[in-house]
């Protein structure tokens, strides 16, 4: 799917009451998907979600995608990448971008966070 066809994909407004709370791929957190294009199937090109990080945990791998994490609520999270980099995502609305295949571990600063997560395939 290219960006032009993605922009012409049918869409709909989803009420927040209809968001499904689902476990992360690795089972160590929660997410509420708010947009997926295309809307059906597992072969998406763009995905927007809000994650709840409740404990220090490894992040799920999403090879071939560009990820971003934007702090919406909470005292922040420290991301430790396998290559030694550390990114602190702190209030009010700290953010970080990274490749989906990067191995990383999140450490909560002080309590649960809610984070906005735009994720898209890098070939778009």
Go through each PLM region and give its residues.
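A short, N-terminal "cap"/entry segment at the start of jelly-roll beta-barrel domains
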Residues: 1-42, 59-64, 78-116
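Short, conserved beta-strand element in jelly-roll/cupin
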Residues: 68-76, 119
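Short, positively charged
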Residues: 42-55
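Conserved hydrophobic/aromatic positions in well-ordered beta-strands
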Residues: 35, 49-51, 119
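Conserved small/polar residues in nucleotide/adenosyl-binding loops
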Residues: 122-123
């Amino acid at each position: 799917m290219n960006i032009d066809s993605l922009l012409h994909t049918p869409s709909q407004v989803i009420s927040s009451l209809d968001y499904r709370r689902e476990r992360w791929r690795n089972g160590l957190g929660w997410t509420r998907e708010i947009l997926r294009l295309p809307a059906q199937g597992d072969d998406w090109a763009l995905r927007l979600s809000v994650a709840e990080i409740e404990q220090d945990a490894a992040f799920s791998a999403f090879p071939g995608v560009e990820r971003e994490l934007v702090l919406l609520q909470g005292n922040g999270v420290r991301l430790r990448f396998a290559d030694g980099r550390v990114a602190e995502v702190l209030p009010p609305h700290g953010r970080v971008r990274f490749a989906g295949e990067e191995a990383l571990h999140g450490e909560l600063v002080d309590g649960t966070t809610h984070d906005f997560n735009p994720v898209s395939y890098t070939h778009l």
